[in-house]
Amino acid sequence: MTRVITVASGKGGVGKTTITANLGVALSTYGEETIVLDADVAMANLELILGMEGKSVTLHDVLSGAASIEDAIYEGPGGVKVVPAGISLEGLRKIKMDRLESALEILVDTSDILLIDAPAGLEKDALAAIAAAQEMILVTTPEVPSISDALKTKIIANKLGVDIIGVVINREQHDKTFLTITEIETILEVPVIAVIPDDPEVSRAAAFGEPLIIKNPKSPTSNAIMQLGADLIGEEYQPIEPDKKGVISKLVEGLLGRR
């Protein structure tokens, strides 16, 4: 049976879309037929992170009734299938979110896992993305405002009958001003299923329009997301160790190599 999982955050700017994109690629590398759908029809970013901008048919066209969902599915990095939301303001004006459910029914028949990247906040489009799923992953940073918004999202999901798999803490740092894992689990009353470290490699990958787990599979964030993907489907994952050579050693080798 296809699993439909919405990735939501409540608060914007917590890295939800980056995690969704890379998680989709990770699940595909494990052999799962995975589709990632960008339901953030107003502020779409998924296609930029995956380097797939400029597609001719997008979710905008589907929700406006101008195209079928099958025409908006594209092959993405690592074999993941992607339904981009589109960035056209004209297309945004024509969409009807009540068409989302029927579009998702078609996608369910063609995938093992359907990941939905939900918009931030709790407006109509965000609620539609949450209600369309059977399960939900909450993404938050370990800061009070982010946790507060995640709690509101969790309450709405519970009312809609959506099963919350757990919380992903993103951009974790060793900072005493941040909430601890125990505190976050106590507030949200759901388990923390992954802790993603604050990693400068994320921004570098985004600048290249390439998923981090492909561009730099040895990075701490890549390993954490691959582990999250493995945990979701009951697979084993052996972290890829970074090169042990320090910066000085690499510099010396580079200089010697120029002789």
Please provide the spans of the model-predicted regions:
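Short beta-strand "acidic-cap" motif of Rossmann-like dinucleotide-binding folds
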Residues: 33-38, 45, 115, 139
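Conserved catalytic-core segment of NTP-binding enzymes
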Residues: 102, 106-109, 113-208
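P-loop/Walker-type NTP enzyme "switch/lid" segment
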Residues: 36-109, 206-208, 214
